[in-house]
Amino acid sequence: MDQSGVLLWVKAEPFIVGALQEPPPSKLSLHYLKKVAAYVRTRATERAYPRLYWPTWRHIACGKLQLAKDLAWLYFEIFDNLSERTPEERLEWSEILSNCTTKDEVEKQRNQLSVDTLQFLLFLYIQQLNKISLRTSFIGEEWPSPRNRPKSPSPAERSSCHNKNWNDYNHQAFVCDHLSELLELLLDPEQLTESFHSTQSSLLSREAVTALSFLIEGTVSRTKKVYPLHELALWQPLHAANGFSKISKTFSLYKLEAWLRACLTTNPFGLSACLQSGKKLAWAHKVEGATKRAKIACNAHMAPRSHRIVVMSQVCNQTLAKSSETLVGAHVRAHRCNESFIYLLSPLRSMTIEKCRNSTFVLGPVETALHLHGCENLKVIAVCHRLSVSSTIGCTFHIMTPSRPLILSGNQTVTFAPFHTHYPMLEDHMARTGLATVPNYWDDPMVLGGEGTDTRVFQLLPPSEFYVFVTPFEMEGDTAEIPGGLPPAYQKALAHREQRIHNWQKTVKEARLTKEQRKQFQVLVENKFYEWLVSTGHRQQLDSLVPPPAASNQVAKKDLTWSHGALET
């Protein structure tokens, strides 16, 4: 570690939210990205540098890299969602798009969008995180590596961190292994050889180091305040170590790289730190007969608000419902949760659901990405900025989203349906995350994985099978109906069903049954209703809405939780 007491680490969010869980196109390799980096710097007057506008990126991606336009926009939009914008600005953008009546009008509005060019290049490069590695596939463990690479996690940690997007060991290893390439991407063209390589005398601009803050941050002498990389790099006591020159306002590439390698350490707010020293949360109760107890932990007690993580595993055969300050703005990961009904009714930063089966997830608005992997027979109900699914079987998504759902590789029988529930604080939570009711692309998914453009991998829920979902809890708030309403076909199906019920009730009323007949009829209806509850699994949910007595004693005072079907403080 550097003697100044500086600690640097790789940020988790660019990988959790920004890196697609899919191998990148071959044209996003380092070879082509270096060409893109050189190209944009020579076209500063053409809206390419230092801000890259959508029309310029569209030209580069489609014309030079031969990417499909939808894929080019996907990368641009994902990165834009990572940029710092207020909820009000995001709602204003949604309103602008909702007023567009044609695709040409939408494209005209997109043409005004721009992103930081150098940070966008780094973002494109980290898509290599999920590149298929034949070496890793064959040997299972990394080859002998440089000393600065992190140690492999323990077997227990490895089982919990298998997802590369969540594994901070992988984040650090990726940046350490590719640090030279990342820095070369940020060099001005005159600092590179004809073959796009750096030299011992190459100099890096302050703007380039500022861009690197997209991936790296740190602290000094273990203080609680977290600084972006460029602020630490420009700190006077570190100039000799990192090669900054006040005269040229540049960094020596050779010294900067050595300094970065010396200071990089494991993310103190990452998943591994949360698993090792996070606060255990008694949100789930012990299920009789269960072989493993639910594990729920967070780092809220030690992490800044923007670095919050909540992880839950092995929640089985129960209803778990929370509306908690601990969840607000957190990256949440649910792992191996089975046969359960899970309600997380707070505004979330991101949500990842992995290897869960036969469960229902009802989520508060997800500000960035909602991703599912390796799940089977789930129902997911959420308002989210982006949904992506990979390796799922028989999952249904009732969603409201301003971007097209992503179907990655390995999915079977994916069903999309309109968002169909509400809870009292929903619209307030949507405003806090910058999510609006329009535009809403729930029914227009984008197939990206091995299935190519095969639309048979998904279906839209038939209106005849559609029912409104009632969130069975009480809490303060003003939302009393589904935000934005329902699509006409689904609203019509509900109205038709309600009319049939009304007609049936009228028929029963006009039948003039005797008291004994009414009693027999009531028993028959109740028995049929009970059979329906059991066959649909709703009986299990109703039973689990009443928690065991011990669970009520485990509630944190400031959290909202459930008791007898109501959310309470």
Swiss-Prot record:
SMART domains: CARP. One of its GO terms (cellular component) is cytoplasm. Gene3D superfamilies: 2.160.20.70. Plays a role in the regulation of centrosome and Golgi apparatus positioning, with consequences on cell shape and cell migration. Its main location: cytoplasm. The gene is Tbccd1. Disulfide bonds: none annotated. It holds the Pfam family TBCC. GO terms for biological process: maintenance of centrosome location; maintenance of Golgi location; regulation of cell migration; regulation of cell shape. This is TBCC domain-containing protein 1. Keywords: Cytoplasm, Cytoskeleton. Belongs to the TBCC family. It is found in: Cytoplasm, Cytoskeleton, Microtubule organizing center, Centrosome; Cytoplasm, Cytoskeleton, Spindle pole. InterPro entries: C-CAP_CF_C-like, CAP/MinC_C, CARP_motif, TBCC1, Tubulin-bd_cofactor_C_dom. Residues 304-435 form the C-CAP/cofactor C-like domain.
